[in-house]
Design a protein with these regions (language model features):
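FIC/Doc superfamily catalytic core
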Residues: 1-375
Length: 375
């Protein structure tokens, strides 16, 4: 069975627009909720949220490829590129993707072109410049294949167009993106445009390495471009949580030009990501309210533990904080941990579940769990 780029109608993707209409409506509504919530935050809080969002997007898009970055170094590097105070140096991998994240969220009106993609690739591959051809499309004569398994039982998941076709293929994709922009002659809704662009880019697989991360960067860039402001969408996190399904959806779409199934999957994942962004903003407001009510009555250990729980975000510590966790965070004794935690419950900062050694403590704010969007 041929790959989609070998079909006569390539690269003319088709999809069932009426089936995608509900998803576009849901996403536009969700994006509006997020944008409205961001607009009502204090500037410093909004800036912190944006930094955290870019940090998590960088961590997640890298984790999809099996690359683990240093969280603190990455956050510090993002702050530095935004002109904010930074308290530590970053390695080349963290520094490069940090600069890429800032570029994605601060130049949304600029059309994508070859040079922009080359610049992104150089940033992304900063730590591997001595081993890879960076900032240019691949040129090797060998087939570009995505494979798995040992040599004697290798499975080819995808084979991309030959290297000598890549520049022309990318020129067609970039021209399509310009035509389908909000102010272009053939504008497309945000999800259809970003979803097709991601699929099309991955089918070309134009770089020697880093195609998945660049492809997901394109998604973020196009969504920001569609709405004219950062949305903290965090699509990479949604893809990471459904990593196997993400790869299956891309692999299935690589055999056909009807992209309906791919777009429906992509839309559901992107809407889920937007809902998590709303949850994140609500968490920030909830924790601010909680702190205002108890801050003056906390000792330094209690404050340290609460701040650690806040730092973990709305999805961590869902199983609850244990006394052992508290001791590890604060370096205190068992008796002191028990007393501190009991006081936090009385103050209304924490809720306790279970009893004895099974006691678990939760922040006294709404626990929100976002389920995958069903379209």
């Amino acid at each position: 069975m041929p790959w989609n780029w070998q079909l006569p109608d390539w690269p003319h993707f088709t999809w069932d627009s009426p089936r995608l209409l509900r998803a576009e409506t849901l996403f536009a509504r969700q994006a509006g909720i997020v944008a409205g919530a961001l607009a009502h935050l204090e500037p410093a809080t909004r800036q912190t949220l944006l930094v955290d969002s870019m940090r998590d997007e960088a961590l997640d898009t890298s984790a999809i490829e099996g690359e683990l970055l240093d969280r603190a170094s990455l956050q510090s590097s993002i702050r530095r590129h935004l002109g904010l105070q930074a308290n530590r140096d970053a390695g080349p991998a963290e520094a490069g993707i940090a600069e890429l994240m800032v570029a994605l969220h601060h130049a949304p009106t600029r059309p994508l072109d070859h040079e922009t993609l080359f610049a992104w690739h150089r940033l992304l591959m900063k730590a591997w410049q001595s081993r890879l051809s960076t900032g240019r499309y691949r040129s090797h004569p060998e087939p570009m294949q995505i494979v798995s398994g040992p040599d004697y039982k290798r499975r080819i998941h995808f084979e991309a167009p030959p290297s000598d076709c890549v520049e022309d293929e990318m020129t067609r994709l970039l021209a399509w993106l310009e035509r389908t922009a909000v102010d272009g002659p053939s504008p497309l809704p945000p999800l259809a445009r970003a979803g097709i662009a991601h699929l099309w880019f991955e089918c070309i697989h134009p770089f020697e390495d880093g195609n998945g991360r660049i492809g997901r960067a394109i998604v973020e860039y196009l969504l920001v471009q569609s709405f004219g402001q950062p949305l903290m969408t965090g699509v990479a996190g949604s893809f990471l949580r459904q990593r196997k399904a993400y790869y299956r959806a891309l692999e299935a779409a690589s055999r056909r030009l009807d992209a309906t199934d791919w777009l429906l999957w992509f839309a559901a994942a992107t809407i889920e990501a937007a809902r998590r962004s709303e949850d994140r903003i609500a968490f920030v407001l909830d924790k601010a309210r909680l702190l205002r009510g108890v801050e003056a009555r906390l000792n330094t250990r209690q404050m340290k533990a609460l701040l650690r729980m806040f730092e973990a975000g709305p999805e961590d510590f869902i199983g609850g904080l244990s006394a052992a966790n508290y001791r590890a965070i604060t370096g205190t004794s068992t008796a002191t941990a028990t007393r501190d935690l009991s006081e936090l419950v009385v103050l209304g900062a924490l809720l306790r579940t279970g009893s004895g050694k099974g006691s678990r403590y939760h922040l006294a704010i709404p626990q929100r769990r976002v389920e995958p969007s069903l379209l």
